[in-house]
């Protein structure tokens, strides 16, 4: 499942941050991507919700510090939906 999540996130991140060659890692955070500001963060989260057909709670969104945190939340939500 993590591979499918990584593929989806890579596509979303490349589109939202306008970086077609961007490679994501679990440790990647807003400090690593020039265009990752607060507005881009919200846009990215909405794209993730739409792509994976999930909904984030405010506290979940506030707790995301890096891509690894995001993957963990997505996995949890997808497992809950099965």
Where are these regions (language model features)?
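Phosphopantetheine-dependent thiolation modules in NRPS/PKS and related acyl-activating systems
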Residues: 2-36, 40-46, 50-82
């Amino acid at each position: 499942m993590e591979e499918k999540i990584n593929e989806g996130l890579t596509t979303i991140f490349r589109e939202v941050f306008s970086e077609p060659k961007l490679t994501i890692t679990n440790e990647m955070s807003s400090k690593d991507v020039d265009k990752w500001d607060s507005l881009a963060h919200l846009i990215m989260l909405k794209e993730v919700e739409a792509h994976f057909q999930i909904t984030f709670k405010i506290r979940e969104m506030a707790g995301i510090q890096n891509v690894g945190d995001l993957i963990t939340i997505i996995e949890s939500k997808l497992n809950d939906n099965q």
